[in-house]
Amino acid sequence: MFVDSVELLISSGKGGAGAISFWTEKFVIKGGPDGGDGGRGGSVFFKVDNNTDTLSGLRGRNHIKAENGRPGEGRKKYGRKGQDTTIIVPPGTTVVDMETGEELLDLVEEGQVVKFLEGGKGGLGNMHFKSSTNQRPTYAQPGLPGITKQVRLEMKLIADVGLVGYPNVGKSTLIATLSNARPQVANYEFTTLTPKLGVVHISDYDSFMMADIPGIIEGASDGRGLGLEFLKHIERTKTLLLMIDAANYREMKYQYETLLVELDRYSETLAGRKHAIAITKIDSLSQDEVNTLTQTFLDDIGLKANDTLKKYKADMNYLSYGFKTDFGVPLPIKEPLFVLPISSVAHLNTEALRYALGDFVKNVKEETEAEEK
């Protein structure tokens, strides 16, 4: 089961107490202090592991605690350090302080290890408190307490392409068609209640990750429907595929503008994501009807149909649009990279979409890397 958020009480270990002890030996009547120091308490670490894809393994573990340090002993023996605890999380996990709402950690990179809570320091044994006026001190320090925090772990999916659209627009069917994912598919709204990931293969050596995310509705950024949960998950997707239902009673321009408004209201970062458009369910209409709707939509958003997507073997009997990429020409931000009518059920233009998205992801990655240099 997918769990995208879990609340935990996390504590580092308490430091061990310093020992009060005096040297004992035959013929030694009053030996000096020899109490050793207590061991440091165990620390708590977070580690990012690509082999973990949910937070479900942490469910039920209400209190995660590192081991306390052991107390010191006589003969100046130090107490053993408490054992550290490492919490394994998937990439894309954030750690939020439940008391303040502050985001404490953002765990993204595979293999990343971060110390979260330091263990308490061990107390000093009485051997440290001998002085000229006190040869046999009877005092040793207690260990310092560990640190406890109430946190919420949130997992935000990291995918190359996030599918965005109204409920029942065909996201689950598309991801099942293009990838190895098998999301629940049915003809009613909010079939997808939790995000799903699928790997879309371009070749034996090339692939990208696609996220099927719960449908968006007007007011999603205010928390209506599954809105805020949905938007939280697409924050990290690198590109967006906006899906518009050709058979929906809402006109396509309205669907498109609603999606853009909700993205913009929720996050400037999301509003700046590069996107493409798939016009779905064209098998339920005639070719002429689809072309009429597509032409109207392109006119409404100021674009002209062209044959740019022919290189991906798109069916040219259907109108489509593709941005003509060229070396040194930045990808568009406010307009779609391409507009392609598809039918996942009839497998119409789905292979063209696969390869167009593959190039889209590649181009965005190259552009991002160039900007970071």
Curated annotation (Swiss-Prot):
Q: What is its EC number?
A: 3.6.5.-
List, separated by semicolons, the cofactors it needs: Mg(2+)
Chief localisation class: cytoplasm
Which GO terms fall under molecular function for this chain's record? Answer: GTP binding; GTPase activity; magnesium ion binding
Tell me which Gene Ontology terms the entry assigns under biological process.
Answer: ribosome biogenesis
Q: Where is this region: Disordered?
A: 62-83
Keyword annotations of the record: Cytoplasm, GTP-binding, Hydrolase, Magnesium, Metal-binding, Nucleotide-binding
Q: What class of enzyme is it?
A: hydrolase
For this record, an example GO cellular component is: cytoplasm
Could you tell me what this protein is called?
Answer: GTPase Obg
The species this protein was found in: Sulfurovum sp. (strain NBC37-1)
Identify the gene encoding this protein. Answer: obg
